[in-house]
């Protein structure tokens, strides 16, 4: 009798908790909770709870997971995945240009204002030590240990954050990350204004912590950068990745997900492929699982796993996506935090007076960095800065002044030049990313793909130098 009462009470509690969660999510949706500079923090608690649950469950059938992504190729089954993406490389951009309408007049939008909220992740609570219980490490006294910790903190504070850039090697399109100089040494020649001072009274803009936040993001982007050399373990990885990314963009656009979700999904996918050799006919499962993980991390309301399975046309079942999610998270050690390029673009847009024209064009150019295989291994902050630089050139704006250099993280024109050349090569070249180009030819995105392609073709035809254009 008592056991039945306990079961009934537990069911009642669970139903009340689910009801409370649904009501709280509905309230958040009705209030239009602003996204913070580090992403949507309202969903982090659920994500951490699910991750901890996955850790507790563990890999009960490890031998099965080892065979989940077999190493041998199965060409016959892979044809079912690649047959629907055999579009011509030459006809995609011409179709986009032929279907264009009258390009609308650009204007400014106050709704594009950056909104931030305070993030407590950089503040930690100090642990109080009892006077009667002293913690020793190898018979060291508390005073000696505290002095040693303070010394380490002073040494860390003296370190300057390196600024990474790209250096072109020979005639090949190979790039290598280098530490050129420190931020203070780069910016000492330029004058810039403290644009965060005007936001000191706005708690949503976190002007006091914004520098610490972006210092952390610059550190995080180096840690989560995929190793391009490891991707060559896969056969025909460039072509297969192009097909997979094109399909992911299609599903992302169909579900109406956030841009941050797409960037995170591609980053998780690239990092996983660097660690694991995947069978060709399992690539679609990898892409689906990565998009499913990213949507649960970034979105307030994530699409159901049944919807993801339905979009694969029977290639992946619900159980396959669940197994893929667990396997990918375990392989990445549940490290899915990512320095999203949208965060850096919002920061640079502050120095650009939040202009919607250049910002929309920069979104299109910045998304090229995840669809083109050449951009793997380039820092997201550098891609965001190059996209903003090139978008301003398209609109005939002024020079890359001190404010833009400072709020981009110290990227000068010389550092942006190699990445801008890669963006130009993509715009004037052929591609199979038809879903990506069609997405940005709509009025919602101010026909950014049409404007960018026409401008790039004109610049290359006349032999203009993009670095000195409109200066």
Curated annotation (Swiss-Prot):
GO terms for biological process: cell division; G1/S transition of mitotic cell cycle; G2/M transition of mitotic cell cycle; G2/MI transition of meiotic cell cycle; mitotic spindle organization; positive regulation of mitotic spindle pole body separation; regulation of meiosis I; traversing start control point of mitotic cell cycle. This is G2/mitotic-specific cyclin-1. PROSITE patterns: CYCLINS. The gene is CLB1. Keywords: Cell cycle, Cell division, Cyclin, Mitosis. Pfam families: Cyclin_C, Cyclin_N. Belongs to the cyclin family. Cyclin AB subfamily. It comes from Saccharomyces cerevisiae (strain ATCC 204508 / S288c). One of its GO terms (cellular component) is nucleus.
């Amino acid at each position: 009798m008592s056991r039945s009462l306990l079961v009934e009470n537990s069911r009642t509690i669970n139903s009340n908790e689910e009801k409370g969660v649904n009501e709280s999510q509905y309230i958040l949706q009705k209030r239009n909770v602003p996204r913070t500079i580090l992403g949507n923090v309202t969903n982090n608690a659920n994500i951490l709870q699910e991750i901890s649950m996955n850790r507790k469950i563990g890999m009960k059938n490890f031998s099965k997971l080892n065979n989940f992504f077999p190493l041998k190729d199965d060409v016959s089954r892979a044809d079912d995945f690649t047959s629907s993406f055999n579009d011509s490389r030459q006809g995609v951009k011409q179709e986009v240009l032929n279907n264009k309408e009258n390009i609308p007049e650009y204007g400014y939008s106050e709704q594009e204002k950056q909104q931030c909220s305070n993030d407590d992740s950089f503040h930690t609570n100090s642990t109080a030590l009892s006077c009667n219980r002293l913690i020793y490490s190898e018979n060291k006294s508390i005073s000696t240990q505290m002095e040693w910790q303070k010394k380490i903190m002073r040494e860390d504070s003296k370190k300057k954050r390196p600024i990474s850039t790209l250096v072109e090697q020979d005639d090949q399109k190979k790039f290598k990350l280098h530490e050129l100089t420190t931020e203070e040494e780069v910016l000492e020649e330029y004058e810039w204004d403290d644009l965060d001072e005007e936001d000191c009274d706005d708690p949503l803009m976190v002007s006091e912590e914004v520098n610490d936040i972006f210092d952390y993001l610059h550190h995080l982007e180096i840690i989560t950068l995929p190793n391009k050399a490891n991707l060559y373990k896969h056969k025909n990885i460039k072509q297969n990745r192009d097909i997979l990314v094109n399909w992911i963009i299609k599903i992302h656009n169909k579900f109406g997900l956030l841009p941050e979700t797409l960037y995170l999904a591609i980053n998780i996918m690239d990092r996983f492929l660097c660690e694991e050799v995947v069978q060709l006919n399992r690539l679609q499962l990898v892409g689906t699982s990565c998009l499913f993980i990213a949507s649960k991390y970034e979105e307030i309301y994530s699409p159901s796993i049944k919807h993801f399975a339905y979009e694969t046309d029977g290639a992946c079942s619900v159980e396959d996506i669940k197994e893929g999610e667990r396997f990918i998270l375990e392989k990445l050690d549940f490290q899915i935090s990512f320095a999203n390029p949208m965060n850096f673009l919002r920061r640079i847009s502050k120095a650009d007076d939040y202009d919607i024209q250049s910002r929309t064009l920069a979104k299109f150019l910045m998304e090229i960095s995840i669809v083109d295989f050449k951009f793997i291994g380039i820092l997201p902050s550098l891609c965001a800065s190059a996209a903003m630089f090139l978008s301003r050139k398209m609109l005939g704006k002024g020079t890359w002044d001190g404010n833009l250099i400072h709020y981009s993280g110290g990227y000068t024109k010389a550092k942006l030049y190699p990445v801008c050349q890669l963006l130009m090569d993509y715009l004037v070249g052929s591609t199979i990313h038809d879903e990506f180009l069609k997405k940005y030819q709509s009025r919602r995105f101010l026909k950014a793909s049409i404007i960018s392609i026409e401008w790039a073709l004109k610049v290359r035809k006349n032999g203009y130098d993009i670095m000195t254009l409109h200066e």
